[in-house]
Amino acid sequence: VDALKKFSIHVSIDDYNEAFWRLFSSDLVPAIHPTGSVPTFESDSREKGGVISFSAESVVSLYEHLKKQSMMLHYNQASQLMMNAYTFIENLEKKNFGITCFDISDFIVINGQYYVFVNDSKIVELDNKDDVLVIDEPIQKGEFMSPELKNLTRIPSRIPKTTTLFSLGSFVGTMLTGERLKAEGDIHSDFIYSIYYTKLYWCIKQCVERNPKDRGYIYI
């Protein structure tokens, strides 16, 4: 077993408070248990955010993780990424927040097997009553954005919260197959055909439906 090292994650979103960061920290617990330390949160009033600190065997960026294996994930790794990211989506929704989109630079990999989302600049307000993300300022663009987010023409705007699922599905699918989701045509067979009949195939397929109302997350 590798010796434990200390790591920290700096955060600085105005809307967050200590209670929210305790929820965020809980996402780290499965990644560092049982060898790591319980994450701690220290607020910083000057930055209107804080620092989450913890110990683990290793922490690398997802990009560094991918470089070791031809910039792709194996099936079990992609499944873990999908489940880890969706758990974080669910945790955010409980606090009325959502994520605009995903990309390689948004994740760290803890102990070589757990994927944690750390890009707080992509977190926006979620209206749980209407199931929409509230976009009230310019957002960070990304390759794996949903069509409705790519075509956003005015701010403020409200877009279906399933825009996050579209991004998650297209992102994980590309990490696994190396294929890009096409703008037109039979995106499912071209995009993730190589994993047809697997649990992850059907999960991704539903995430990337063109109609936001048809999207969902089912991984069974």
Predicted feature locations:
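Conserved structural core of kinase catalytic domains
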Residues: 32-76
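Activation segment/activation loop of eukaryotic-type protein kinase catalytic domains
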Residues: 98-144
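Conserved C-terminal C-lobe helix
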Residues: 195-210
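ATP-binding glycine-rich loop module of kinase domains
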Residues: 1-42
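Activation segment signature within eukaryotic-like protein kinase domains
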Residues: 81-82
